[in-house]
């Protein structure tokens, strides 16, 4: 008998200002962007039974209405914060999803992702049917195919019309199991100072690109962000790199979602057409 009442537990953090990386639509209206993304997320969930924690970071009341129009009151838990920003709310997401008892599958969501309808169950199913897969990003990162950093051998698995490709980094939006999150929670919860380096964390968890001093030396000149991420991975997570479990991260192609950063659209999909087909409801 399944001990869980829901198929998925979600911690969805939302902030009322547009990112410094402008989105492809509604670059001057965060409320419309948030509504578009949230409506698309709801449509993508299909028939999944979802428990939602809403992390409102300095949000006016109208942002609560975005969620209350889409989910029943019993499926919503409100968490309010006074403008604590990304790093703090991310740690809260991890804490909430580790401690909850509603679902085995957990999803940490940021407010600037757009989803395709009825697609999210595919990500949940992939994790269920692949015990050696630990994390899934719904976003098929374009830089996986274009940058030197990601020029590494990849494994591909085919499931439900998607090619699922192994990779080693994503953002702070990802799907995993509650037990996996508990295993490696300290990597996500470590005090990284004023930064919250997602690339460094994923390097430590997947153990990719952290054992190549030649590349580190070269990138110290040509791409300091990559080199800096390797340094941060070792500085904060050396125990994980040397003694921890090696985790795997997977992304779908074609993508299930798009990170709303202009110029970083997931490949192979006409995203503008998708946005136009699902305008934000008033």
Positions of predicted regions on the chain:
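Short loop->beta transition adjacent to catalytic acidic/histidine clusters or analogous donor-positioning motifs
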Residues: 8, 44-53, 76-77, 104
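Short loop/turn segments at strand-loop or loop-helix junctions that form parts
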Residues: 8-19, 57-58, 138-141, 253-255
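Active-site-proximal specificity loops/subdomain of glycosyltransferases
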Residues: 60-104
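Short, acidic, metal-binding catalytic loop of nucleotide-sugar glycosyltransferases
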Residues: 24-49
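C-terminal catalytic/acceptor-binding lobe
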Residues: 3-5, 178, 183-282
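Short, flexible/disordered intra-domain loops and linkers
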Residues: 18-32, 188-193
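Conserved catalytic core of nucleotide-sugar-dependent glycosyltransferases
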Residues: 105, 114-190
């Amino acid at each position: 008998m399944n001990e869980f009442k829901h198929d998925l537990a979600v911690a969805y953090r939302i902030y009322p200002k547009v990112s410094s990386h402008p989105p492809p639509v509604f670059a001057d209206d965060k409320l419309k962007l948030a509504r578009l993304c949230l409506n698309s997320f709801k449509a993508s969930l299909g028939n999944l039974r979802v428990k939602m924690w809403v992390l409102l970071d300095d949000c006016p009341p109208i942002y609560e209405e975005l969620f209350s129009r889409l989910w029943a009151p019993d499926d919503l838990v409100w968490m309010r914060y006074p403008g604590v920003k990304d790093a703090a709310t991310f740690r809260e997401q991890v804490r909430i999803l580790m401690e909850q008892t509603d679902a085995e599958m957990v999803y940490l969501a940021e407010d600037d992702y757009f989803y395709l309808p009825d697609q999210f169950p595919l990500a949940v199913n992939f994790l269920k049917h692949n015990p050696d897969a630990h994390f899934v990003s719904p976003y098929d990162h374009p830089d996986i195919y274009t940058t030197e950093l990601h020029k590494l051998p990849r494994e591909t698995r085919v499931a439900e019309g998607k090619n699922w490709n192994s990779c080693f980094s994503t953002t702070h939006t990802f799907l995993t199991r509650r037990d996996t999150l508990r295993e490696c929670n300290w990597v996500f919860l470590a005090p990284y100072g004023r930064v919250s380096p997602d690339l460094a964390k994923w390097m430590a968890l997947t153990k990719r690109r952290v054992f190549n001093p030649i590349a580190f030396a070269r990138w110290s000149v040509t791409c300091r962000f990559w080199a800096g991420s390797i340094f941060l991975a070792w500085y904060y997570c050396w125990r994980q790199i040397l003694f921890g479990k090696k985790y795997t991260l997977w992304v779908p192609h074609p993508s299930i979602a798009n990170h709303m950063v202009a110029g970083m659209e997931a490949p192979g999909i006409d995203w503008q057409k998708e946005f136009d087909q699902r305008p934000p409801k008033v």
